[in-house]
């Protein structure tokens, strides 16, 4: 069964073009190292909920937009191998303080699908 990494971040609207460049660089690298799919989505209908919501989860500010992304792998074992290669890839070595989003507010995790259609 496949394995999925999911990510949610808040990106300043003024930095969206920079983030898109980063995503367009990172995606092919993930795929080159063995990911089956790499998807980045920009929030279109993500209201700020009273108790829970995507914007609340990442403490999105008024000038930020929510990005929801996921990467699909063949298995957890494949994900671990792909992730090790991605993290070691010199093309993604960056200064985290210069990223176009606040990584401290990123939420992420690995998931085992239980329904795939």
Labelled PLM ranges:
Residues 1, 29-30, 60:
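Short, conserved, surface-exposed binding loops centered on an aromatic residue
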Residues 4-11, 50-86:
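Short, well-ordered beta-strand segments in beta-rich or mixed alpha/beta enzyme
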Residues 20-26, 82-90:
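Short amphipathic alpha-helices in soluble, non-transmembrane regions
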């Amino acid at each position: 069964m496949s394995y999925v990494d999911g990510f949610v971040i808040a990106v300043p609207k003024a930095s969206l073009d920079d983030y898109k460049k980063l995503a367009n660089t990172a995606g092919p690298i993930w795929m080159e190292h063995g990911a089956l799919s790499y998807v980045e989505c920009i929030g279109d209908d993500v209201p700020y909920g009273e108790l829970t919501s995507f914007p609340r989860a990442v403490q999105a500010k008024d000038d930020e937009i929510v990005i929801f992304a996921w990467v699909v792998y063949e298995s957890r074992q494949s994900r671990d191998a792909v992730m090790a290669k991605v993290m070691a890839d010199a093309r993604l070595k960056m200064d985290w303080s210069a990223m176009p989003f606040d990584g401290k507010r990123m939420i992420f995790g690995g998931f085992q699908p239980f329904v795939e259609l």
